[in-house]
Amino acid sequence: MNNFIGIGKIVDSAENGRVLKFDLAIQQERPCFVPCILFDPTDEVKESVDQLQTKNRVVWLQGRVSMNEFEYQGRTIRKIQVVTYANGIRPI
């Protein structure tokens, strides 16, 4: 089963067409920034994410872990991110 649940603050959100990317800042001894992506977000979800980031609110986030692998300048690059579920972001 591939299930990610995290609690943190949304930072660095950016919309690019049908994709919303952001980081989930998880507070620990050293903050951990988890890259997240949300496909085809509704206007309501986009506005909600923007408000949660602006108000610096702590959120509960659920999604699945995804790894992309590609070649760049002869090197294999691996990128891990959380594909967030549309209803998987809730303020705490």
Kindly give the residue locations of the regions a language model identified.
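Single-stranded nucleic acid-binding surfaces, predominantly the OB-fold ssDNA-binding core
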Residues: 1-92
